[in-house]
Amino acid sequence: LFENCSWSPDFSDHRKWCLPGETAARDRLHQFVTRVVDKYDHDRDYPDVEGTSRLSPYLAAGVLSPRQCLAEITALQGNGQLPDFATGAGSWLNELIWRDFYSHVMVAFPRVSKGLPFQLITEKVKRRYDEKQLQAWQQGLTGYPIIDAAMR
């Protein structure tokens, strides 16, 4: 796979990426919250920096819970309050909330993962696909003041 590449990936420390066990998971959470989370909203998009939590395996396996993550984030705040969602910590917490929400959606409404609607009664609703109307909506130029104001 990599013989035609000008670089050679080094997988020698791949076992260190996700150490097993609850202690390792808690340590990773603490490291993320104390060292990385402040810049998460920016750095998460750059694979060349350590900008993500790397907690997905622990969350997926149930080794860490979203509640534990929330407790660590609120402890970081020092006042027991939720972080401002415009910060790195708030951005990460928001994504964690959506992750948890959609895992519940998939359990309760598995048909959604197959392209079907939440409410089956709406399945036969005819959809309009009008590029001009879509662009007007995206630009806040629908002619409906409340909609246009929200889009701008």
Place the predicted regions along the sequence by residue:
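Glycine/tryptophan-enriched, flexible segments
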Residues: 1-122, 128
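Flexible, P/S/T/G-rich "lid" or insertion loops adjacent to the active sites of thioester-utilizing
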Residues: 123-135, 139
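Helix-hairpin-helix/helix-loop-helix acidic hairpins
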Residues: 135-152
